[in-house]
């Protein structure tokens, strides 16, 4: 696939991960059509990218609405070669998990694939869907020290059992949305020509592409680091844990997922290593003199023991071999994330 002016559609283009992806696409020479939920959001994004002539935006107010992406593909279907479906509902402030998490995630995936089939079946060659480690393992599995997460594993929760709480329902939504995509591919092989890959990242940390995005709220993973910076000395904190990956590596993987033929048909499990909040606190206290003595310390040095006793194992050697690049280390990622956060706070 030639880079020069290949048209890539990016759903949810105004999001944390998607902004990095859009930036990498433009720098690599692709033409990008993105979607956002409102004209205001779209105009804001275009302004941030200085009205780049290779970037345009379309409105998709609700990805879960019937035929949500039809207008986009009716208008641009004959030029779009690659689709990166990054948009997904992520919120935990609900008690109707089926209505607010499960159904929107599944319908969003279904609607974009149906739109490709109906209006761009002869044009779209590659589809990459942003899934999650949550599709690979249930919350219970993530805390099982004998469990190994890899590219072949699946979250074992059912549609019913995942509705025990908001976190389980979100994890379930990622599983069922991804399964919808693979099932669609199998059921429609005779009427489509695109290959499918999924990106399955763990907790995604790293700096915002545009620092001022921090003033408009941040993604749930980045909020973990923001909260650690705001905790006072002696405060208790929740010791989050799981696989982590740098947002800049997630972005790079989205491009390689459609550029490298060997990534077609693959689930790419993005994990540099396991992390816990205690390890992040240790880094913050070690690397930022202005925070030392002011923020929580927890039990310095206890992170690795905590992970050994409370976390599953990750094996993504297959993904690393397919992608062929080194992921950013946790320390570098946390330092970059916190540096940006502190700089923005100092100016507000």
UniProtKB/Swiss-Prot annotation:
The keyword Repressor is annotated on this UniProt entry:
no
Q: List the disulfide bonds.
A: none
Q: Does the keyword Phosphoprotein feature in the UniProt annotation?
A: yes
PTM-bearing positions, type Phosphoserine: 339
A GO cellular component annotated for this chain's UniProt record is:
cytoplasm
Per UniProt, which keywords does this protein have?
A: Oxidoreductase, Phosphoprotein
Q: Which domain of life is it from?
A: Eukaryota
Q: Which SUPFAM superfamilies match?
A: NAD(P)-binding Rossmann-fold domains
Q: Which Gene3D superfamilies match?
A: NAD(P)-binding Rossmann-like Domain
Q: Which family does it belong to?
A: Belongs to the NAD(P)-dependent epimerase/dehydratase family. Dihydroflavonol-4-reductase subfamily.
Note in the entry:
Present with 2340 molecules/cell in log phase SD medium.
The protein's name is Putative uncharacterized oxidoreductase YGL039W
Q: What is the lineage of its organism?
A: Eukaryota, Fungi, Dikarya, Ascomycota, Saccharomycotina
């Amino acid at each position: 696939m030639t880079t020069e002016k290949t048209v890539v559609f990016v759903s949810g283009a105004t999001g944390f991960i998607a902004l990095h992806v859009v930036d990498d696409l433009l720098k690599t020479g692709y033409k990008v059509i993105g979607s956002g939920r409102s004209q205001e959001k779209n105009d804001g994004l275009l302004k941030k990218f200085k009205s780049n002539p290779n970037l345009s935006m379309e409105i998709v107010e609700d990805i879960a609405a019937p035929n949500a992406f039809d207008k986009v593909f009716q208008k641009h279907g004959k030029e779009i070669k690659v689709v990166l479906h990054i948009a997904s509902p992520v919120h935990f402030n609900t008690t109707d998990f089926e209505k607010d998490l499960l159904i929107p995630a599944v319908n969003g995936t279904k609607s974009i694939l149906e739109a490709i089939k109906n209006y761009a079946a002869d044009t779209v060659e590659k589809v990459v869907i942003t899934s999650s480690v949550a599709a690979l393992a249930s919350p219970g599995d993530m805390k099982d020290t004998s469990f190994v997460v890899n590219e072949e594993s699946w979250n074992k929760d059912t549609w019913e059992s995942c509705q025990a709480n908001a976190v389980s329902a979100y994890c379930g939504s990622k599983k069922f949305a991804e399964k919808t995509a693979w099932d669609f591919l199998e059921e429609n092989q005779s009427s489509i020509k695109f290959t499918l890959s999924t990106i399955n990242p763990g907790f995604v940390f790293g700096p915002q592409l545009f620092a001022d995005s921090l003033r408009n709220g941040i993604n749930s993973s980045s909020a973990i680091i923001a909260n650690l910076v705001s905790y006072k000395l002696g405060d208790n904190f929740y010791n989050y844990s799981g696989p982590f990956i740098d947002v800049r590596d997630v972005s790079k993987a989205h491009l390689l997922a459609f550029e490298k033929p060997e990534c077609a048909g693959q689930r790419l499990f993005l994990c540099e290593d396991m992390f816990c909040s205690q390890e992040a606190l240790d880094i913050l206290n070690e690397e930022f003199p202005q925070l030392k003595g002011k923020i929580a310390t927890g039990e310095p040095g206890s992170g690795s023991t905590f992970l050994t006793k409370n976390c599953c194992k990750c094996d993504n050697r297959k993904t690393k071999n397919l992608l062929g690049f080194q992921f950013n280390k946790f320390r570098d990622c946390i330092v970059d994330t916190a540096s940006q956060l502190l700089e923005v706070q100092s100016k507000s």
